[in-house]
Amino acid sequence: MWKDLFTKKKKYASIPSEKVRSEVPEGIMTKCPKCKKIMYTKELVKNLRVCMSCGYHHTMPSRERINSLLDEGSFHEYDADMVSVNPLQFPGYIEKLEEDRRKSNLNEAVITGEGTLNGYPIVIAVMDSAFRMGSMGSVVGEKITRAIEKARELHVPFLIFTASGGARMQEGVLSLMQMAKTSAALKLFSDEGGLIISVMTHPTTGGVSASFASLGDYNFAEPGALIGFAGRRVIQQTVREELPEDFQTAEFLLKHGQLDAVIHRHDLKDTLTTVLDIHQGGGGHGWWQS
């Protein structure tokens, strides 16, 4: 009996091999990809989605950006119901569009409209990478072109925020045509004295970077934004040279004269207001030359 007491094996509770799932609901917390700090999403949104620890600029949804810049209640959206079709009958394209509409609560990769920024009337276009990675298809090109034409009609500045992976491959050459179409609209607008302000956000690449994104009278960018046409690996294999670590970043482009300024998101509204102040002149729409 005494022998059994001392030789009896201890029993241990078994631990499940599966990872214990977090009880924190999805969306409550956000992890910064740069410094790895975990923060409340609500606090991050209040800080314009700029990391409170390292200053990393997280992706900002288009409607949040519009609300952060324009005067309250001043925004009127254009072409909200315009949606893409499948002109080339590309397999699975319609299903992907429907999935993105459901997930992003957007109809397309750009929102356009008019409003006032600290009292200045403007036409604005804001791209959103949550929808098809902000890719430019026929509808994106059409909405941006119509917005430019509206700014031309109203004699007000045109402000665009870009965030895109480039042309939308599912629409083939129809997508590539939007590069020429939007650029031509900007040329007409500029020739008549219209003010164009472009703000490139992460990422601005492909056909978007090679067309309307780079055609502003002022070309600004947010810190750390990836900006370029072809991918880093493609360029490296073509030139057969090691590229700088900061290649295709906003800071690299600024250093080489391709940007006018890299602007922290917290300073963006004040900077845009200053630009409008300068071009406004003595009152009215002083930015319109003709």
Curated annotation (Swiss-Prot):
Signal peptide: none annotated. InterPro entries: AcCoA_carboxyl_beta (IPR034733), Acetyl_CoA_COase_Trfase_b_su (IPR000438), ClpP/crotonase-like_dom_sf (IPR029045), COA_CT_N (IPR011762), Znf-ACC (IPR041010). Residues 28-290 form the CoA carboxyltransferase N-terminal domain. GO terms for molecular function: acetyl-CoA carboxylase activity; ATP binding; carboxyl- or carbamoyltransferase activity; zinc ion binding. It is an enzyme of class 2 (transferase). One of its GO terms (biological process) is malonyl-CoA biosynthetic process. It holds the Pfam family Carboxyl_trans. Gene3D superfamilies: 2-enoyl-CoA Hydratase, Chain A, domain 1. It is found in: Cytoplasm. Its EC number is 2.1.3.15. Zn(2+) binds at residues 32, 35, 51, 54. Belongs to the AccD/PCCB family. Component of the acetyl coenzyme A carboxylase (ACC) complex. Biotin carboxylase (BC) catalyzes the carboxylation of biotin on its carrier protein (BCCP) and then the CO(2) group is transferred by the transcarboxylase to acetyl-CoA to form malonyl-CoA. This is Acetyl-coenzyme A carboxylase carboxyl transferase subunit beta. It comes from Geobacillus sp. (strain WCH70). The lineage of its organism: Bacteria, Bacillati, Bacillota, Bacilli, Bacillales. The gene is accD.
